[in-house]
A protein has these predicted regions:
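C-terminal and inter-domain tail/linker signature
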Residues: 1-136
Length: 136
């Protein structure tokens, strides 16, 4: 699935938008970089997406938030976060948006990446424990 075009996103986002993603994904500034650095890899590396809906939605002033546990299931078809193809996994996601005028200007996205990686067979906490506390 190809990412949306800059024109499509420009209907809802300011050109100088900022997207703050979790550590392995990073942050992006401007619509073209958002497409290149996040939306493109996310759509090309993950297939079979199933949205489970939002469990909570709330807003106040210029801010809105939603989350779901899980909110999205997908299949790692290879390349996402540098990983080879893997199985289906759930993503636990929190999205917080800020609006400036009639368009979105910022988006903070929290994804429980360690949980997603564990479902792909990589337990980063166990691996870190093994590195820091090697068996004698």
């Amino acid at each position: 699935m190809e990412p949306p075009s800059a024109e499509e996103l420009g209907r809802f986002w300011h050109e100088d938008m900022i997207w703050y993603g979790p550590a392995p994904i990073g942050a992006t500034y401007t619509i073209p970089r958002y497409i290149k650095q996040h939306t493109g890899p996310f759509r090309r590396g993950l297939g079979g997406k199933t949205f489970h809906g939002h469990k909570v939605r709330f807003a106040e002033g210029n801010f809105a938030c939603f989350f779901g546990w899980p909110n999205l299931s997908n299949r790692n078809i290879g390349g996402f976060l540098g990983l080879p193809a893997g199985g289906t996994a759930d993503m636990q996601v929190v999205d917080v948006y800020c609006r400036r005028g009639d368009k979105l200007s910022e988006n903070w996205v929290l994804i429980d990446i360690p949980w997603w990686l564990k479902q792909q067979g990589l337990d980063v906490f166990q691996r870190t424990s093994e590195i820091l506390n090697p068996a004698e």
